[in-house]
A protein has these predicted regions:
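Catalytic cores of alpha/beta
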Residues: 54-58, 229-237, 270, 276-294, ...
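Short, ordered loop/turn segments at secondary-structure junctions
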Residues: 70-73, 124-126, 133-137, 185-187, ...
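Alpha/beta catalytic cores of nucleotide-metabolism and tRNA/nucleoside-modifying enzymes
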Residues: 1-20, 98, 160, 170, ...
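Glycine-rich phosphate-binding active-site loops on the catalytic face of alpha/beta enzymes
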Residues: 61-76, 239-251, 290-308, 336-370
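Hydrophobic faces of well-ordered beta-strands that scaffold small-molecule active sites
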Residues: 42-45, 64-68, 94-96, 157, ...
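Bateman/CBS regulatory modules and CBS-like beta-alpha motifs in cytosolic regions of diverse proteins
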Residues: 24-39, 45-47, 76-116, 121-123, ...
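Active-site-adjacent beta->alpha loops and helix N-cap segments on the catalytic face
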Residues: 24, 73-82, 140-144, 188-208, ...
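Terminal amphipathic helices with adjacent charged low-complexity linkers/tails
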Residues: 70-84, 121, 125-141, 172, ...
Length: 482
């Protein structure tokens, strides 16, 4: 038997090259799938201590994308997707509406379900007759109060199609209002514009958005009928990308799940994983996958390689899979500890990277905040940990029918230092990538994937690469040991 050598991020360094590229001018745009572009090559992990709607919103505003985890009921996960799609919507087409005969109770129920603060009021023909805002509802005493009593029906701020953003902003400023109704020539409601959305568009010019100006969001699903039903609900909620998320993507079940998910919609992209070999990549592309997620056991909280003895060191896995994928994007999932690892993953052939531990300690992550020995931490666990598997992710590790005391975990539960806003972490990650692009003379992500060269280093070389012979007295925001 021939035993092949394989490398990971700490085994190599990028070789500097002649460069006219300034880090500030480097182009970090990339394709996460064949049809969806990102402005920064980053995804947040589909983990229950990393990504729900708050993280997904932050990721999309920064130019990346969040993948909402699936340790939620189908309806809960779909609700998280809807929250992202409605957070910064440009023009909200087909907004949630009320009729004059509905009640305050109906409005509250819709408010809770869709996380919105106001509703256009329309008649049976779809013509605008009023608007109800959160302020109007606060002054109503009874749940059976009709909408017609609460709504504002006079001097409505209405803009006819085609709606111009600058005209809309001027009208809202002149009328001192936060919502603007958009109608067609017959007075029928076609959309809704909010002041918040117009302001967010200015604050986040590189946000990752769909054709309608809504933030993009992905969500995880699984195999079998349960996965198909979940995928259907996610499509109905407006998800942009479905991730068939399993520990071992090279299986007939995953390939079949890709085929079924692709049949749901021509608009939604399907990512499949996780894999670590060229053969697996070819199988999933043959099933119709729009991108491949690479990584068997490299994550900081993953114990698959110790429990099962299976995996491929991440750098080699990325290189093998990217070569086999051709023009189908590859996502490097796991093992990234520093921004330099992120740059190495891109140089190895990944179109983008997925990070978990680096974002788990941020404000936007759903993990519990813990105070320990005078410092703040946030809970972080692998989806193969006992706690996560008991909550619903056991099928990711093909243990769906196992009793809770018979589960064989492939991950641990722990904590990571509190890091503040996720935006700061993303800034440092992308800043490190830009620095690498400057050092290697690569103006674009595609050039970096194609032109970079590696040099293999020894243990002494790794020691030399880290801070040495000094005691750190003030921590850096992008470098931490232990």
């Amino acid at each position: 038997m021939e035993i092949r050598e394989a490398l990971t991020f700490d085994d190599v360094l990028l070789v500097p090259a002649k460069s006219s590229v300034l880090p500030s001018t480097a182009d970090t745009r990339t394709q996460v799938t064949r049809s969806i572009a990102l402005n920064i090559p980053l995804l947040s992990s589909a983990m229950d201590t990393v990504t729900e709607s708050s993280m997904a919103i932050c990721m999309a505003q920064a130019g990346g994308m969040g993948v909402v985890h699936r340790n939620l009921t189908v309806e809960e996960q779909a609700r998280e997707v809807r929250r992202v799609k409605r957070f910064e919507s440009g023009i909200v087409y087909n907004p949630i509406t009320l009729t004059p005969d509905q009640t305050l109770a109906d409005a509250k129920a819709l408010q809770d379900r869709y996380n919105v603060t106001g509703f256009p009021v329309v008649d049976e023909a779809g013509r605008v007759v009023g608007i109800v805002t959160n302020r109007d509802m606060r002054f109503a005493d009874r749940d059976d109060t009709p909408v017609r009593v609460m709504m504002t029906s006079e001097r409505l701020a209405i803009l006819q199609e085609p709606a111009d953003r600058e005209e809309a902003k001027s009208l809202m400023k002149a009328r001192r209002i936060e919502k603007l109704l958009v109608t067609d020539g017959q007075g029928k409601l076609t959309g809704l514009l909010t002041l918040k959305d117009t302001e967010q568009a200015v604050l986040n010019p590189t946000a990752c958005k769909d054709e309608l100006g809504r933030l993009r969001v992905a969500a995880a699903s699984t195999v079998g009928d349960a996965g198909f039903e979940r995928a259907q609900a996610l499509v109905d909620a407006g998800v942009d990308m479905i991730v068939i998320d399993t520990a071992h993507g090279h299986s007939e079940g995953v390939a079949h799940a890709v085929e079924r998910a692709k049949a749901l919609s021509n608009e939604v992209q399907v990512v499949a994983g996780n894999v670590a070999t060229a053969e697996a990549v070819r199988a999933l592309i043959g099933a119709g996958a729009d991108a491949i997620k690479v990584g068997i056991g490299p994550g900081s909280i993953c114990t698959t390689r110790m429990v099962a003895g299976v995996g491929v060191p991440q750098l080699t896995a990325i290189m093998d899979c990217a070569q086999a994928a051709g023009d189908v994007p590859v996502i490097a999932d796991g093992g990234i500890k520093f921004s330099g690892d992120f740059a190495k993953a891109i140089a190895a052939g990944a179109s983008c990277a997925m990070v978990g531990s680096m974002l788990a300690g941020t404000d936007e992550s759903p993990g519990e905040t813990i105070l320990y020995q005078g410092r703040s931490f946030k809970a972080y666990r692998g989806m193969g940990s006992l706690g996560a598997m008991a909550r619903g992710s056991a099928d990711r590790y093909f243990q769906k029918d196992a009793a809770s005391d018979k589960l064989v975990p492939e991950g641990i539960e722990g904590q990571v230092p509190y890091k503040g806003a996720a935006g700061n972490v993303l800034h440092q990650l992308v800043g490190g990538l830009r620095a690498a692009m400057g050092y290697t003379g690569c103006a674009t992500v595609e050039e970096m994937r194609r032109d970079c060269k590696f040099v293999r280093i020894t243990g002494a070389g790794l020691k030399e690469s880290h801070v040495h012979d000094v005691q750190i007295t003030r921590e850096s925001p992008n470098y931490r040991i232990g």
